[in-house]
Curated annotation (Swiss-Prot):
Residues 190-210 have a biased composition (Polar residues). This is High osmolarity signaling protein SHO1. The chain crosses the membrane at residues 38-58, 68-88, 97-117, 120-140. It comes from Leptosphaeria maculans (strain JN3 / isolate v23.1.3 / race Av1-4-5-6-7-8) (Blackleg fungus). Residues 1-37, 89-96, 141-336 are cytoplasmic. Residues 59-67, 118-119 are extracellular. Plasma membrane osmosensor that activates the high osmolarity glycerol (HOG) MAPK signaling pathway in response to high osmolarity.
Amino acid sequence: MPVYGSVSSPSLRKMENGYGHGQRASLSFGRIIGDPFALATISIGVLAWIIAFVSSIISAIHGGFPNFAWWTLVFMFFCIAGVTVTVASDAERTYHVAIVGFLAAGLVFTTSSVNSLVYSPIAPFEAAAAGYILLSMIAVRDCISSSLSQPATNAPRPQIVWIFYYGSQPQASHRAFVDSYALHKEHPGSRSSRPISHGYTNRPETQVASQAPQMYTSAQLNGFETSSPVSGYPGGPAGANGRNSSVPQFGGMPNNGIPNAATPTQDEAHQQEASIEYPYRAKAIYSYEANPDDANEISFQKHDVLEVSDVSGRWWQAKKPNGETGIAPSNYLILL
C-alpha cells in the first residue's frame, strides 16, 4: 500500500485542487438550471407565490381577508428563497435539516390559509385559495382543476415533495434517482451508496507524511560521518555504502553519487505506521467504499467503530478493528 502523503494519491489530488478549509461554494444559478427537479419545483413555488400575493391584494380590497394568510405569504416567500439559495450554492446537504423544519411549518400555514379561503363564494377569495393550493401542490393542472371544483385535500404538495426529498438520506433510492438528472451532482455508482462531499481540505499530516528523512552524501558530510551504525539506514554508518558496498543507500542513492527520490521501504513504512497513536474513536454513520484507484482509502460499514489518529481536516487517518489503516472522510464519522 502506498504511504500516506503520496503525491499519486487521487484523494490528495482532490484535496489540493482548490478546495480549502472553510471555503464557501459560490452562488451559481446554473446549478438550478442544470437540476430539473429544483428548476421545476422552485418555478412552481415562485409562480404560486405570485398568484397568491396578487389575489390576496385583490381580496383585501373587497374586505374580510384573513390576516393569517399574510403571514403565510411572508413565511413561504422566505422558504422558497431559502431553498433557491441552498440549491444555487450547493449547500443542500448542510442545511437540509433546517429546510425540512421550515417546510413542515409552511405546510401547516398554507393548508390553514386554504381552509379559510376556499369555501368563500367571492371570486377573489377563490383565486387567492387557488394560489395557496398551488403553493402546496406539485402539479399546476391538478391545482386548477381541484380549485374549480373542490379543495384538493388529497393532492400532492410541493412541501411534501421537498420534505420527502430533503428529509431523506442521499443514498435513498428516490433521491439518487432525482439527483441522477442533475448536471452538477456526482451520480452515485452501483458500487457506492455514500453522499458526496464537495468541501475538501488538506489531509491531516501524519508522522509518515510529515517526517521525510534528510539524505546526505559522503562529500556533503565532509568528515562528520558517525562511526557507529545508524538505526534505520541499511549498511551501517552514513556514507559507508558509497565506499564499501554496492547496495544503494536509503532513498535510492546509487554509488555514482546521483540522488534519486527518497522513498522509504515497506518495512520502514510499517514501522512508522505502527508508531502512530490513535487516541480517538469514531463511529461510522454511513457506509463508505474506498476508491479502487487510491490504496490509501479504507472501506467501512455503517456503525463500524474506528480508531482515529487526528481529527483535523476533512480526511482522518483511521484504523479498523482488524488492524487495517488508511484515510476516511470525516463527514462519514462521528466522534465517540
